[in-house]
Design a protein with these regions (language model features):
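Class II aminoacyl-tRNA synthetase catalytic cores and aaRS-like
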Residues: 2-687
Length: 687
């Protein structure tokens, strides 16, 4: 039984367990060496059968008195902002301020200087202490301050004194340091103590199990959470005040419906019945459109039981909106206004009035991705018509494939480019491309000192065409890749993934500068349906098809409608994704607002069974009751904040993220169900 990362497992010895339980609580201390954790000194762990660990076995009366005193601490009468205001009227005033004790310097037995950090840990003022009696006759505040450990929370009763600011270039230039005044300590109320077994320094690295200390010790995490709060406020103000949206909360206990992703089920005490946590508020917001709500918005919690990556969490937050009597253009213009305001107010960055549009087909053709990073350049071109047949056979086993080429300008020195290629191909990042069943990439380096500039395998004519097409210069990396001659499906192609991997490696090794700025684009004209994927649940129809996004998306045009039954894979969706710097910030669509049409798509195109159709009866009924045309979108809020702050992982902008295995390492969730819980919810584990 693991109590924590510092506790000792007692499961191996029932005899030891029995002896421990027979001892008084204060004696149940293990002298065995505890497990190692970063950021802590070793200390014994205390076992309690109820699962509670005691950190002290001191005098109970003393503990009660300490806590009683902390209940009576004085209210703050002055803020750090007021202290920093250069207001001379504050001098010699008695104030109460709250904060955390910082570094202390004992100048002598009778003179101590200490830092006091404000509640947000963003500002610091100097405390000055000399021996006195407390205002209530208690022990000397001077002694209390000298005994308190750094990071302990306190209430300071003191007098503001003017302080001569240090000369330019000679003083402490730390951000938030108040230099115009200091506070002479008259009394101090210790509100808690910071334990001596936790070592907190600027360079201390705390593990996820100590997320509270990560946040406390890392101002970038605290700043990200504050930034996130401001962004949420701006989103609400822009949509509700400027665009007349109504913020509405939708239920978290929903029902299981086959929308495309795996769900989390919540069992009930009624045998066989369970709720499902919503993948998104999609159906509820469409129901609101049929309820006479013209514009809905919610900063919503959503849940998906899917594979985790840097930009995925099992629970996540999205800015969810829907508009009645609206088209895709209406939604996109509204979202552009929100994005402009966010970037303007939080980053002082000018975003274009409107964002460019690019079809799914164009994005996949030019960049090998449906969320292209336009800042990288390196557009992909088709060249199978000019590449010799023997070269095609050398780069893969495919017969009559599509062959694509791109260039990446690594270095002006061809030898440096060769060195980079060797390093990359030997790295783990290259393995997916080396093991591609459709063939490895052909990699060439343009070098004017070589025959045909290093492109001799292309033959004279093709080498000349490729040089002119790509505008090649010495040191440019030329990549050739074959793929099956099929329509695009999914989110990327091998050469598109290689484009990103090579750029990332080139930046890492100093050959290219990291891309800067923000490049926004809308990706539209997605296929409405895709072939079923065994790794995803889809909608459970029998047609071998799945809705590419969800089954409520409308075909784009009348021409697409004509193909719905005869050529469903050729139908374009009225769907649009907002992409910036290779990240999909969000996606939306115009919805099917007709009950007959919605039923046709589910029953006739996807071939859902009658049982599956019953899962959507509520929505069909809402659409039948005169639901107006409507469209909407959801912005991934965690992802949006990460992109704005330049973070690689959404975990850096979430207070308590899950690990790559979906675990909360601090609170140790998820937990194993007990036999009692299993019995309550009528569950059994299959062997």
């Amino acid at each position: 039984m693991t109590l924590s990362s510092r506790a000792i497992s007692l499961a191996a010895s029932s005899a030891l367990r029995s002896r421990l339980l027979s001892l008084p609580p204060a004696c149940r201390i293990l002298s065995l060496e505890p497990a190692f954790t970063r950021g802590r000194r070793s200390r014994p762990a205390i076992y309690q059968p109820e699962g509670i660990r005691l950190y002290s076995s001191g005098n109970t009366s003393e503990a009660l008195q300490k806590f009683k005193k902390s209940l009576q601490f004085p209210s703050a009468t002055c803020s750090f902002e007021q202290l920093a205001s250069q207001n001379q009227d504050l001098n010699d005033q008695r104030v109460v301020i709250h904060g955390y004790v910082g570094a202390r310097r004992d100048a002598s037995k009778n003179l101590t200087f200490a830092e006091l950090h404000d509640m947000s840990l963003g500002s610091t003022v100097q405390l000055v202490s000399t021996p006195t009696k407390g205002v209530d006759g208690s022990d000397s505040p001077h002694n209390v301050l000298r005994e308190l450990r750094e990071h302990s929370p306190v209430a300071i009763n003191g007098t503001i004194k003017a302080r001569k600011a240090p000369s330019a270039g000679k003083g402490d230039s730390r951000p938030g340091l108040i230099t115009n005044v200091e506070v002479k300590v008259d009394d101090i109320t210790a509100l808690n103590t910071f334990p001596d077994d936790i070592i907190m320094a600027k360079d201390t690295v705390f593990p996820p199990e100590q997320r509270h200390l990560q946040i406390r010790n890392d101002d970038s995490l605290r700043n990200a959470l504050a930034f996130r709060s401001k962004a949420a406020r701006i989103v609400r103000n822009e949509l509700c005040d400027e665009h007349s949206f109504t913020e509405i909360e939708t239920p978290l206990l929903f029902k299981s419906t086959p929308e495309g992703a795996r769900e989390f089920l919540v069992p009930t005490r009624v045998p066989g019945l369970a709720y499902a946590l919503p993948q998104s508020p999609q159906q509820y917001k469409q129901i609101l459109m049929g309820s006479g709500i013209p514009r809905y918005v919610q900063i919503a919690k959503c849940f998906r039981d899917e594979d985790l990556r840097a930009d995925r969490q099992p629970e996540f937050t999205q800015v969810d909106l829907e508009m009645a009597f609206a088209s895709a253009e209406d939604v996109m213009r509204t979202v552009e206004a929100v994005v402009r305001r966010l970037w303007s107010e939080l980053l002082a960055y000018d975003v274009p009035e409107t964002f460019p549009r690019m079809s799914y087909e164009e994005a996949m053709s030019k960049y090998g991705s449906d969320k292209p990073d336009l800042r990288l350049g390196s557009e992909i071109r088709r060249v199978e018509y000019m590449v010799p047949v023997d070269l095609v056979s050398k780069i893969g086993p495919l017969t009559d494939p599509i062959v694509e080429v791109m260039k990446i300008p690594i270095s002006e020195d061809a030898n440096e480019t060769r060195k980079f290629v060797g390093t990359f191909m030997d790295s783990p990042e290259a393995q997916p491309f080396i093991q591609n069943p459709h063939g490895q990439p052909g990699i060439f380096i343009f070098d004017s000192r070589k025959p045909l500039q290093g492109l001799q395998v292309f033959g004279f004519e093709a080498a000349e065409q490729v040089e002119e097409m790509l505008e090649l210069e010495d040191g440019d990396l030329v990549v050739l890749q074959a793929r099956p001659k099929e329509d695009f499906s999914g989110g990327s192609t091998p050469i598109g993934n290689l484009r990103l991997a090579l750029h990332k490696a080139a930046v890492k090794h100093g050959y290219l500068r990291a891309p800067e700025g923000f490049a926004f684009t809308w990706i539209n004209d997605f296929p409405l349906f895709s072939p079923s994927n065994d790794s995803e649940p889809g909608q459970g129809g029998a047609a071998g098809l799945a809705a590419t996004h969800h089954p409520f998306t409308s075909p784009k045009t009348a021409e697409d409608m004509d193909l719905l039954l005869s050529e469903p894979l050729s139908v374009r969706a009225d769907h649009y994704d907002l992409v910036v710097n290779g990240v999909e910030l969000g996606g939306g669509s115009r919805r099917i607002h007709s009950a007959e049409m919605q039923e046709l798509v589910m029953r006739e195109v996807l071939k859902m069974s009658d049982e599956r159709m019953k899962d959507f009866e509520h929505l069909i009924e809402v659409l039948r009751a005169g639901c107006p045309p409507h469209a909407g979108l959801a912005l991934g809020f965690d992802r949006l904040i990460a992109v704005m702050l330049g973070k690689e992982s959404v975990r850096d902008v979430i207070a308590f993220p899950k690990s790559g295995k979906g675990e909360d390492m601090l609170v140790k969730s998820p937990t194993k169900m007990t036999d009692g819980q299993m019995e309550t919810y009528h569950l059994k584990l299959r062997a």
